[in-house]
């Protein structure tokens, strides 16, 4: 009987899990009435939002390089003269006066250029008002959207994708009866533009806007070609018409004159025509297959299945509304894979990084201009890149960093008299690096250093020494800036940033009368510690100048330690001025826990508890992207149930019907933060070991995952049951020792009890200073689960199976 029960349980588990393998679809029983109900398609360069209307189909279009303005700079040379006085005021505690001086001398009138829409392609169908049997979906396993419905007994279907293989958008429109397909195609563009017919294509030329005194010099040219089966294609001055066709394939090609952030001499029409001419050489079936193949090469690397009741027969918008009333693990998995889908669709090698809205934006001037906010948002976009097996999607960010390191040299020299390069809290297509938006938000010189963390993390995950060599100068340039910029605090004696802020926050809140401009915030100290340590370690690996390594180490030794304040919290500032009822969206001083690796529950338990107290004081409610961050932080806290509580908050008012994250409004970083957070709940490799299932919530009692990545070039497959690891298969790409951490005892060939320090260089973290602790508190320490640690000596290319004991 025992074995029969076990067999039945295994069968039920398999059936429950397998029900999610083929259900990675968003689907709806009505067209989109709002942009946040439309479905996103993208090939990294061309973005499309598909509304799925019956009478009128709207395809809202974006091209990743279509931004307002033209090459410009926003450095203010007055900053260098004002810098000594600003520092003097800060060190005297006159923060508001210092901030006012920064506003006067550090800013320009150029706060960044907005990412812009091209407009929409409108497809008008005749007499399709009274449609029935409506169905609309996005299949994220294929990156293909479709719409179907009936009118007067005739079934109409549309299928479209933004082709990774052919660099155009391709749409197939068909019907179940010959000759029943008639429609008109036109453009709706909110910008200065002209529409005409060119070479049997509907043609749009749109001009990007001027902005903040910077002339708009980018042009987008879009061509629409119809290839019909049956019927007739004709044109008026501004409309493409199809009459009585059996089916039609539309090819939509779009390009701009952008070449790089300094060069806009490209031929947008030549590029658009080139893409189009190549695409139409293939029939629809071939183009579709090649697109799916290219997309699947990335997406199919990782599979996640979690056991629960299957609600995939309900529309996605209804599942979102009901998420907190039941355990819909399938929706949690769909949302996880949707983040990977969005990253592939908005960030492929050779393109621009995903901006604040990825590549999807309906406005001339979007919220926050849909730029690159680098005091967390751009970084969060790329948190899932390595761990969820999409390392190639990181490449556009690395290319941007090269360009920012060039542009930021001038800013460092002109504004601060420093070597190296600097980036403040925002940038755009033109790689602006100066202070923007006002001192309260913009006087933060750490954006470049934080972004350099991604270079080091890519190396830790891939072991790619050629990559490290290529980008070493970018890291060194950022480190060089801080070697010059840091100043000795006259009271504490530490080397600190000044002026700076704790992102978008001040000790007295965020209002017009408060000041954020201070010296040596905890996040600054943590970021500077990382860039100096990572550059030091890269220098050693690449056999660079030993004297430079010594200089870096000397500066590291003079940085401020973290501090635990009077509320047993991790202090956000040098002074103990945190408020326990502070609910600000940024939790900047938690950087050292995530995405940093400076705070360990095992090596720094009191600090670990202080961060937990800070998280509890900040609360669980937040903007969409902040919720994404909190999922990761609570995963690092090894508290899967609290992480899941945050996930519930995400689905309660912070998720739009199309699964876009809601700040509100839409910001894509929250989607990526969620995906990274779920991965962090399943696998962690930051704390000198590979920790399997470190933060599994009660709701996810059984499941399996294949294709997660870990530092040291390891690939992890796992299955768990009853809330505990059942087995794991680990592939080693580079070889070397793998230290494995688990909450349950394990067994496996070659597995031995861990002793001493893990000598695998990919798992060696820099040692931080002991924290300074307020004399007003009684020390608090976390209650941790018992852990079992093992070492496994691996060989390159080999796989290892581990099971629970």
Label the model's feature ranges.
Residues 1-9:
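Bacterial N-terminal signal peptides that target proteins for export
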Residues 12-20:
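Hydrophobic h-region of N-terminal signal peptides that target proteins for export
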Residues 22-440, 455-459, 512, 533, ...:
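Aromatic-residue-lined binding/catalytic grooves and analogous aromatic/hydrophobic interfacial grooves
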Residues 326, 368-372, 385, 435-446, ...:
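Alpha-helix capping and helix-loop boundary segments enriched in small/acidic/polar residues
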Residues 331-335, 341-344, 450-487:
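Conserved catalytic-core segments centered on acid/base and nucleophilic motifs
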Residues 376-386, 445-456, 523-533, 588-597, ...:
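Well-ordered alpha-helical segments within folded domains of soluble proteins
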Residues 457-458, 462, 466-467, 478-488, ...:
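Non-catalytic carbohydrate-binding regions of carbohydrate-active enzymes
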Residues 477, 481-538:
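Acidic/histidine-rich catalytic neighborhood
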């Amino acid at each position: 009987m025992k074995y029969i029960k076990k067999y039945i349980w295994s069968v039920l588990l398999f059936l429950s899990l397998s029900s999610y393998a083929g259900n990675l679809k968003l689907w709806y029983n009505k067209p989109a009435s709002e942009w946040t109900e439309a479905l996103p398609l993208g090939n990294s360069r061309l973005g499309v939002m598909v509304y799925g209307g019956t009478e009128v189909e709207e395809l809202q279009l974006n091209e990743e390089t279509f931004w307002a303005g033209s090459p410009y700079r926003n450095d203010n040379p007055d900053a260098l003269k004002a810098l000594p006085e600003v520092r003097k005021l800060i060190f005297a505690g006159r923060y508001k006066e210092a901030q006012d001086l920064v506003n006067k001398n550090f800013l320009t009138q150029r706060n960044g250029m907005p990412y812009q829409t091209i407009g929409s392609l409108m497809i008008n169908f005749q007499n399709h008002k009274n449609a029935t049997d409506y169905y609309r979906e996005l299949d994220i396993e294929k990156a293909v959207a479709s719409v179907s419905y009936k009118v007067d007994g005739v079934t109409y279907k549309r299928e479209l994708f933004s082709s990774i293989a052919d660099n155009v958008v391709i749409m197939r429109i068909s019907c179940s009866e010959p000759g029943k397909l008639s429609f008109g195609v036109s453009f709706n563009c909110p910008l200065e533009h002209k529409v005409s017919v060119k070479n049997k294509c509907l043609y749009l030329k749109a001009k990007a806007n001027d902005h903040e005194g910077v002339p708009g010099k980018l042009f987008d040219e879009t061509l629409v070609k119809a290839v019909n089966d049956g019927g007739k294609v004709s044109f008026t001055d501004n409309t493409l018409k199809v009459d009585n066709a059996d089916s039609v394939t539309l090819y939509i090609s779009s390009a701009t004159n952008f070449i790089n952030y300094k060069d806009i001499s490209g031929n947008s029409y030549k590029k658009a025509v080139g893409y189009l001419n190549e695409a139409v050489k293939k029939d629809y079936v071939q183009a579709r297959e090649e697109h799916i193949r290219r997309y699947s090469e990335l997406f199919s690397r990782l599979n996640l299945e979690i056991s629960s009741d299957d609600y995939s027969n309900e529309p996605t918008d209804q599942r979102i509304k009901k998420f907190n009333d039941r355990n819909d693990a399938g929706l949690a998995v769909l949302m996880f894979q949707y983040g990977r889908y969005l990253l592939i669709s908005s960030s492929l090698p050779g393109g621009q990084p995903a901006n604040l809205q990825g590549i999807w934006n309906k406005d001339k001037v979007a919220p926050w201009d849909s730029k690159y906010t680098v005091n967390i948002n751009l970084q969060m976009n790329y948190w899932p890149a390595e761990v969820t097996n999409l390392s190639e999607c990181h490449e556009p960010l690395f290319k941007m960093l090269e360009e920012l390191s060039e542009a930021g040299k001038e800013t460092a020299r002109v504004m601060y008299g420093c070597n190296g390069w600097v980036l403040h809290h925002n940038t755009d297509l033109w790689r602006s690096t100066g202070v923007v938006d006002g001192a309260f938000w913009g006087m933060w010189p750490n954006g470049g250093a934080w972004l350099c963390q991604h270079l080091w993390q890519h190396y830790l995950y891939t072991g790619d020494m050629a990559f490290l060599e290529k980008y070493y100068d970018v890291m060194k340039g950022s480190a060089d800036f801080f070697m010059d910029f840091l100043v000795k605090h006259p009271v504490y004696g530490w080397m600190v940033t000044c002026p700076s802020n704790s992102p978008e926050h001040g000790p007295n809140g965020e209002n017009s009368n408060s000041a954020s401009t201070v010296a040596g915030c905890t996040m600054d100290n943590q970021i500077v510690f990382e860039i100096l340590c990572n550059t030091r370690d890269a220098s050693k690996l690449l056999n660079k100048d030993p004297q430079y390594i010594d200089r870096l180490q000397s500066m590291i030794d003079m940085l401020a330690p973290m501090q635990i304040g009077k509320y047993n919290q991790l202090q956000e500032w040098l002074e103990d001025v945190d408020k326990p009822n502070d609910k600000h969206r940024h939790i900047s001083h938690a950087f050292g826990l995530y995405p940093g690796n400076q705070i360990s529950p095992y090596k720094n338990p009191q600090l670990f508890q202080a961060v937990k107290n800070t998280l509890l004081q900040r609360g669980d409610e937040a903007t969409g992207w902040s919720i994404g961050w909190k999922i990761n932080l609570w995963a690092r806290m090894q508290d899967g149930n609290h992480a899941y509580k945050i996930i519930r908050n995400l689905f309660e008012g912070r998720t739009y019907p199309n699964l876009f994250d809601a700040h509100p409004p839409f910001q894509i970083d929250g989607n990526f933060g969620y995906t990274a957070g779920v991965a962090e709940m399943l696998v962690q490799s930051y704390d000198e070991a590979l920790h399997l299932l470190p933060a599994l919530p009660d709701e996810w009692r059984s499941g399996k995952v294949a294709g997660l990545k870990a530092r040291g070039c390891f690939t992890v497959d796992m299955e768990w049951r009853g809330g505990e690891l059942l087995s794991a298969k680990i592939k080693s790409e580079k070889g070397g020792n793998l230290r494995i951490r688990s909450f349950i005892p394990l067994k496996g060939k070659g597995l031995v009890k861990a002793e001493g320090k893990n000598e695998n260089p990919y798992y060696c973290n820099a040692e931080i200073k002991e924290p300074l602790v307020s004399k007003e508190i009684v020390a608090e320490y976390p209650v941790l689960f018992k852990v079992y640690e093992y070492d496994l000596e691996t060989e390159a290319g080999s796989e290892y199976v581990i099971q629970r004991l």
